[in-house]
A protein has these predicted regions:
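Terminal leader/tail segments of proteins
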Residues: 1-141
Length: 141
């Protein structure tokens, strides 16, 4: 079954190892085989992997687009996941979902789950910041 892709004007995407850049008009085409596909907005650059959750996303992305080096990325992934679970055990259900998708070699789905981890990580940071502000206000009162 074909995958229909519609690119907006000037949009870029990764198909396999090729970067595709669209021209001035919307373009539509079909992918006939199984190959890694990422839209520009889904691609995280290494310098953006600035938190543990973002590092997980980045490593899953690398597993997806560079399966030849899967083992290297997978080992690093587990190092980070262990640290995350030790620091924030409440992340375990999300990480379990990510791992389930990776085990099934559904890397795109694992990336979607990793987005949930990034969002949850931000919620934890925001909650910790709010708690810190509340504690400071209580001390100065």
């Amino acid at each position: 079954m074909s995958l229909k892709i519609r690119l907006k004007p000037n949009e870029k995407m990764l198909i396999g190892n090729a970067v595709i850049s669209n021209g001035e008009r919307t373009t539509e085409f079909y992918i006939e085989n199984r190959v890694p596909i990422l839209r520009e907005k889904e691609i995280m650059k290494e310098d953006a992997a600035s938190t543990p959750g973002r590092q997980v996303y980045f490593l899953v992305q690398l597993m997806y687009v560079d399966e030849e080096n899967f083992e290297t990325y997978h080992n690093r992934f587990w190092e980070i996941v262990r640290q995350i679970i030790l620091a924030a055990p409440s992340t375990t259900p999300i990480i379990t979902s990510i791992c389930h998708e990776i085990m099934g070699r559904r890397f795109y789905q694992a990336m979607k789950e990793a987005r949930h981890l990034i969002d949850y990580e931000q919620e934890l940071v925001d909650a910790a910041s709010a708690d810190g502000e509340t504690a400071k206000a209580s001390e100065s009162a």
